[in-house]
A protein has these predicted regions:
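N-terminal amphipathic/basic-hydrophobic helices that include classical n-h-c signal peptides
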Residues: 1-15
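A conserved regulatory-domain signal marking ACT and ACT-like small-molecule sensing domains
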Residues: 14-201
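Conserved active-site and cofactor/substrate-binding residues in soluble primary-metabolism enzymes
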Residues: 27, 31, 69, 73, ...
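Short glycine/serine/threonine-rich phosphate/pyrophosphate-binding segments
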Residues: 32, 124-126, 212-215, 367-370
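Active-site neighborhood of HAD-like aspartate-dependent phosphohydrolases
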Residues: 196-246, 250
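Long, charge-rich alpha-helical interaction segments
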Residues: 237, 250-258, 268
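C-terminal cap/substrate-recognition subdomain and adjoining C-terminal extension
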Residues: 258-416
Length: 416
């Protein structure tokens, strides 16, 4: 609604029953909601529903009411009092049949759609909204979860997230179509049921290489050992699912024979964390999460991250060492894709946590079973085969954007 020259738009009142939707807009200031409801209380109004939002200091307040007196006199009284406060008001009738339908829809499934990008453009929201409508869903609410974005901020450092609360039953193809749209728009889109477990997860497990750290440790070891190109080629085949993980691991480790523990220590000290890791772990600790590294990588480096980040559990493969040098062998048993999923399930049982309350995050083909087993599986900056087979993917933002999928806003985290 546009307000020009401080003039209040004319109120339209179409009224035949005692149900009315009152919309009030204007520049926000402390006490407005108290003022409005005080005015309504004098008319003996029952509030059936209420919602309020403030965007850039402008108030939009909606109140669904039941009035005991529906003559023009009290309505004009409400109008005059609201306008005297410098606000705009619009009163519309609500059909009793539609109201009854609204009540009966209570308890219907709701879905949360999370839209993430460095900056969110109108074209992004338009495309997503069109697809929501095309699949027969209705948007009940849109909420910004990310912090306020400075106009002069670098796009590489900014992040934006809005959350859509949807009403209705999503058709089977909804998620797949949204994932295709996300790729076209170069954004991330996550869809999940708005159930009791969404904000009550309790255990989160991470792959290590290319998830918690922005590198593949075995490739770093290979460079120092002088076999970088050979190992990188095998790693790529394994992570894209073109080579059995167990076989690829043994092949790569055999090429590291003779590498010193001292060289491993130097690599461990310079492991680069992925974007948002420290922010995420700070929030997870505050929320009381149990954290785990479940990796096909190596315990030596997992233990280093455990100390740096305060991780609760580390499960990874152990490199055999004799006389302070690698033998080129892996201590059995090897942690492969199945083992990862089994470890997650065992950890949940040990901690007394339902699998619906678990989260798994990974990027490679050997993470797929773990992602599928978790209550919330997230493919993080993952290979194409992993994104395609995962329900959720984050490819444009840092690891801390996982908090948005849990419904946690920047404001909530920053205030602690």
């Amino acid at each position: 609604m546009l307000i020009r020259d401080n003039k209040i738009p004319v109120v339209q009142m179409r009224f035949m029953n005692n149900l009315a939707l009152i919309n009030i807009t204007g520049r926000d200031k402390p006490g407005l909601t108290a003022l409005v409801t005080s005015i309504l209380s004098e008319m003996d109004v029952t509030i059936l529903d209420i919602g309020q939002a403030v965007i850039h200091d402008y108030l939009n307040l909606g109140i669904l009411t039941e009035l005991t007196d529906v003559t023009q006199e009290p309505l004009q009284g409400i109008r005059a009092a609201i306008e005297k406060a410098g606000l705009s008001i619009n009163i519309n009738k609500v059909d009793e049949h539609r109201y009854t339908q609204w009540v009966q829809q209570q308890g219907r499934r709701r879905t949360i759609l999370t839209l993430l990008s460095r900056k969110i453009k109108a074209s992004h929201v338009s495309a997503v909204s069109v697809m929501i409508a095309e699949h027969g869903l209705n948007i009940d609410k849109i909420t910004r979860l990310s912090g306020r974005i400075p106009l002069a901020g670098s796009e590489k450092k900014t992040r934006a997230c809005v959350e859509f609360s949807l009403r209705g039953e999503p058709p089977a193809e909804f998620r797949e179509n949204l994932m295709a749209l996300a790729g076209k728009l170069d954004v991330d889109i996550a869809v999940q049921e708005d159930g009791i477990f969404r904000r009550h997860r309790r255990l989160i497990a991470f792959d290590m290489d290319s998830t918690l750290i922005d590198t593949e440790v075995i490739d770093e070891l290979a460079v120092v050992a002088g076999v970088g190109s050979q190992v990188s080629a095998i790693t790529e085949l394994a992570m894209t699912g073109h080579l059995d993980f167990h076989e690829s691991l043994c092949q790569r480790v055999s090429l590291l024979k003779g590498l010193s523990v001292q060289a491993m220590a130097e690599i461990a000290e310079r492991l680069p964390l992925t974007e948002g890791v420290e922010v995420l772990f700070s929030a997870l600790k505050m929320l009381g999460y149990k954290t785990a590294i479940i990796s096909g990588g190596f315990t030596y480096f997992g233990d280093n991250l455990k100390a740096r980040l305060g991780v609760d559990y580390v499960y990874a493969n152990e490199l055999e060492v004799v006389d302070a040098k690698l033998t080129g062998e892996v201590v059995r048993p090897v942690i492969d894709a199945k083992a990862k999923a089994d470890i997650l399930s065992e950890l949940a049982r040990k901690e007394g946590i339902a699998m619906e309350q678990t989260i798994a995050v990974g990027d490679g083909a050997n993470d797929l079973e773990m992602l599928a087993a978790a209550g919330l599986g997230i493919a993080y900056h993952a290979k194409a085969i992993v994104r395609e087979k995962s329900d959720h993917a984050i490819s444009r933002l840092g690891l801390d954007s996982i908090l948005f999928l849990l419904g946690i806003s920047d404001r909530e985290h920053d205030n602690h």
